[in-house]
Each structure stands twice: as structure tokens, then as C-alpha cells.
Amino acid sequence: MIEVKNLTKTYGNFVAVKDVSFTAENGSILGFLGPNGAGKTTTMRIITGYMPATAGTVLIDGLDIFSQSLEARRKIGYLPESPPLYPEMRVEAYLRFVAKLRGVPRAKIEPALEHVLEVCGLADMAHRICGQLSKGYRQRVGLAQALIHDPPVLVLDEPTIGLDPRQIHEIRGLIHHLAGNRTVVLSTHILPEVSQICDKVVIIADGRVVLEEYLKKLPAGTSLEDIFLSAITKERHEEGASAEETLEEVGAGHT
């Protein structure tokens, strides 16, 4: 389970993420949906321990990602937007390397390697050089490295971006298969991705959560696209109105 509470990240006067809270339950796939620049990647980096927050807490199966970082990060498999591959390494050598970094016991490395190669459809690619793989297969290797230590939590940042339609279909199917008893957070700006494979959606706009709901509880006859557009339009309207009020107050103070 992932519990995010009142997460805020600022850079000087710029607020990238403000008071973000949501929960991803065990065995579920949560779609973290928002337009480009909404704060999705910043949030993903914070909840995986790769970036500090300005304020707020993140619990990974009850462990604080900030104060119990090593223990919490062992429970996470993370696929960033660009898979962290070494292009000169062969697939199996790279995955063995990651397994050692992740603390997989020596006696369990080969079984773990065999498992992720099979699950991710890479059995025939084990001896291939990472840099010579298609983008779809590089993404599969990225998923394999996130799974090599058998984590209970998977965080995937834009896992299908830049793929062709066939590759997108294959990766979505793979993600759905991998979920099982894991908690999966899938960051994306692609509406069909959420509607096809997710159980729950969190919509973020301008660094704020504007909706958190299970897909099956969305109003009947209303599409996710309608809800998404309505939510981000409302947020931006309220943000604009708030800015206007602030300017009026400042102006009144100078009269």
C-alpha cells in the first residue's frame, strides 16, 4: 500500500506539487492522470525516494520513505519515464547487476532472473545488447529491472510513451498481468491507459489533486474524458479566480 499525505514540493517561489494526498491499495492499479507539466513525475520521484519533499509524508507498506528510506525503497520497483539501462550491457548481465544492487541474495539471483525474463517476455532476448533493442523491448527490460527483487509496490512513470500501438497493447497487458497482489501506481497523460487497466484514478492539475475515485464509482453515462476535462478546467478556473482576488487585495492596499 502507498499512502501519500499532504505532499508539497517547492523550488524557490515555484510550487510544483501542493498538498497532494491519495492512497493506493494492495492489489490495485492506480492511474495517476494529468496533463503534461501537472506534477506527475515530481510526485513519482518523491514517492520512490529519489527526490525530497518540502512537506508531507509518504508511507510504503507503513514505512516512511524519508525517515526509513532504505527499508521503504526495498519494497518499491520503479520504472522512470526513460528506462535506466546501460546500452553496452547484455540484458541478462544488466539484470544480474540490478539484482545485486537491490540486495537479492546470491542463491536467488538466477531464479529471479529466469522469472523476470519469462514474465516480461524477454527469454529470447537475454543475450541481446540493451542498446540494440527496440523501444518496446527496452521498456520490457525496464519493467524487468523494477521486478527483479520481487517488490510489493510498482511505480511506473509514463510506461507506454513513445511506443507504437502494438507495443502499447503489449505493455498494458503486461502491466495488468504483473499487478496480482502488488500495489501499482501508473503515471500517465493518456486517458485510455487509465480506463483500460486501472481500478482507481487520481487526477492532478497544476500540482493539485482534483479527483480521487474508483473507476467503477464514476457517474454512469459519463466518460473519463469528460470527468478529466471538467476537473482540470474547474481547477484552473478556481486558480485564476484566486489570483485575481490576490491582485485586487494588493491593489487595494496601495490605494
Label the model's feature ranges:
Residues R96, K100, A107-M125:
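Conserved ABC ATPase "signature" region
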Residues I148-P152:
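A short, proline-enriched helix->beta-strand linker immediately N-terminal to the Walker B motif
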Residues I168-G180:
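Helical segment within the ABC ATPase nucleotide-binding domain
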